[in-house]
Design a protein with these regions (language model features):
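Extracytoplasmic/secretory ectodomains and luminal regions
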Residues: 1-261
């Protein structure tokens, strides 16, 4: 019979360079492993979602290797649970859909340290939204919903159907921008916060509310690092392109093209 694939940590995950988490792993399967993921769960789960788990892809070298061992550097500082104690497990999947899990390992996800007040607020609002596991309540049905004024009322009441932490994030943004044009010197910062507030006001689902994620993350980086944040993002994109090219066995010319893209 075809056995489930095996996955294990070669050694405990640890902090690597530039805030990356270093994962040393080993996998094996008679017919090849088609995918490898890192499963992340909270050590102290949210009572509203006790079984909540996130999965982060771990790149494999080659197609469906029957045996492999490698060290992968993952940037988990943007993860919604950054800075929190979690439990990590490797999940290997073979072509038949069978999965094999490694032993669990306790770990504290690294977080990016923000010192700038604007950056800290942006990050706090961001994770408050992302860590909310509860869904939106359904809007009450309105017999006159076809009337435009009824539609407007419904839209304005959307935030009232949001789960508690998303409502809290909206209040934080309101407090941050109350007469903010007087004391927030950078107009772009003020407008970004107001845009994020508008997104939360209009959202009717968790996915829509989470659209504030890239907006507030970019704002936090820019507030903390200034124009260097753009350079850091370009450098990180180049690093990822190089790693992928090496995994794909690209030629020197192909590597150069990917790095210049």
């Amino acid at each position: 019979p075809d056995e489930a694939p095996e996955a294990r940590f070669v050694k405990a995950p640890e902090m690597g360079r530039q805030d990356r988490t270093e994962i040393s792993w080993s996998i094996s399967d008679d017919y090849g492993v088609s995918a490898l993921e890192l499963r992340i769960t909270l050590q102290t789960p949210n009572p509203a979602a006790p079984d909540e788990a996130d999965h982060v892809a771990v790149p494999l070298s080659g197609a469906a290797p029957t045996s492999a061992e490698d060290i992968t550097q993952l940037d988990l500082t943007r993860h919604r649970w950054a800075g929190m104690p979690v439990t990590l497990r490797l999940v290997a999947t073979d072509g038949a859909g069978q999965t094999g899990l490694s032993e669990p390992v306790d770990f504290k996800l690294p977080e990016k340290l923000f010192l700038d007040p604007i950056a800290r607020v942006a990050q706090e609002v961001r994770v408050t939204v992302l860590r909310e596991p509860r869904d939106y309540a359904e809007l009450a049905k309105n017999e006159d919903a076809l009337r435009q004024d009824a539609l407007n009322v419904t839209a304005s009441n959307r935030l009232g159907t949001a789960p508690p932490d998303i409502q809290k994030a909206a209040l934080m943004l309101d407090a941050m921008t109350y007469k903010g044009e007087r004391y927030i010197r950078d107009q772009g910062v003020y407008l970004t916060f107001r845009t994020a507030k508008g997104i939360l006001d209009a959202a009717a689902t968790k996915d829509e509310a989470e659209q504030v994620d890239p907006l507030l993350w970019a704002l936090a980086l820019r507030a903390e690092y200034g124009s260097a944040a753009d350079a850091l993002r370009r450098l990180e994109a180049a690093r990822r392109a190089l790693e992928q090219a090496l995994r794909d066995g690209a030629s020197e010319d192909e590597i150069k093209q990917r790095m210049e893209a």
